[in-house]
Amino acid sequence: MANKFAIITGASTGIGFELATLAAKDGYDILVAADEALIESAAQDFRQFGTSVDSLEADLSTFEGVDGLLAAAKGRQIDLLCANAGRGLGEAFLDQDIAEWRKVIDTNVVGTSYLLQKVLRDMVARNDGKVLVTGSIAGYIPGAFQAVYNGTKSYVDSFVAAIQNEIKESDGVTLTNLMPGPVETEFFDRAHMLDTSVGADPKKSDPADVAKDGWDALMAGKAAIVSGWKNKIQSAVANITPNAVLAEQHRKMAEPGTAE
């Protein structure tokens, strides 16, 4: 119980897996969660670093799933939260199944907002704690053939910036937005995007590099970090580019059948 305690969501693979690895290496006891059974084997990997590791398979798109995650903390003070759980979805919006696009919104928007509200209340009350949220530079770009996902990340990016302002008097609490671009993870397979230009691109970011960027920014108390120099340029250009142009550019990356 002497170690600090961290919760990392979406930790079975990708960025979340790498964030959990960094937390365990840094001496945090961790509770890791994901919506798949693979989280159990991921937890085994994290135990090699000698801290306490608990895992939970949970649907964090629901209030019940988030409540179950917090209950699994067993009353321990949450010193660090990596709110990384997210869901993608490609293809044309009109062709998407309603249940699938609603799951994206419920996971990325509803679940993330609820988890942050529950955790940040306690952190702000004691004026101590760290939260890293996985947003995306996709939030700056109208996502043709990825419309719902990009819309949810626009919400996350804006939401985090707003909450940072609301809690600015709590100088002991750090809230950081990690904004990567395309990352080499299972995301594109799960989002039905392997036949797209961006899904097939072999030059996507390494999740370990993205996680390290986010971790370093969090520990330095930064408000936000865009991971990767190409993504920094893209996010900056997006602020001065008309939406119609951005949407057409995104279409070329995300339209099904564009993979080379």
Residue spans of the language-model regions?
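Residue(s) in the substrate-gating loop at a strand-loop-helix junction
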Residues: 136
